[in-house]
Amino acid sequence: MEVLKLNRDYSGSLRRASGVLKRGELVVYPTDTLYALGGNALNEKAALKVYEAKKRSLSKPLPIAVSDLRMMEKYAYLDRDAKTLADKYLPGALTLILEKKNLPALLTSDLDKVAVRIPANSAALELVRLVGGPVITTSANFTGEPPPVSIAEVPRELGAEIALDQGNLGERVPSTIVDFTGEPRIVREGKIKADEILSAVG
């Protein structure tokens, strides 16, 4: 795994990483919450590599990162409440579970829904823009292990070709997950508190 430090001008590193993703290989990249293991979300072989690398059950869908609401609406259906939350908190530590469209079955474990987010991290957003489509965003660890907040905590055995190093990301607080495939339901409380979510969609 080649580690590329994201210094002041990291455009070249992002271009290299986007090229790796377009080839169907894996990249470790920073988000606003943790280091993620990424693959091209539209490439089933890349999704399978992520499952195998993390030792993750194929019955557990993989979340995706998009660069903006326009890209989100290309791959998922946003109802009024979901749009309200997205407008208020994204980019940010919020993951929305939405009915999917135009995504491979393997990525979503044959389910009709997908977990999608827009991370508040400029490097992550630019990486997704350079790829031109959604990027898998799952913690860069083995399933069941603590999520990494530094590159030193990322197992080399994950098989990522490149790791983008932005230093220590700080506290291990995950994104808040809200399911909009039925009545809005908080699946996991993270950085954004449940009462904030409920007041926004109530």
What is the role of each PLM region?
Residues M1-G202:
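Active-site-adjacent structural elements in enzyme catalytic cores
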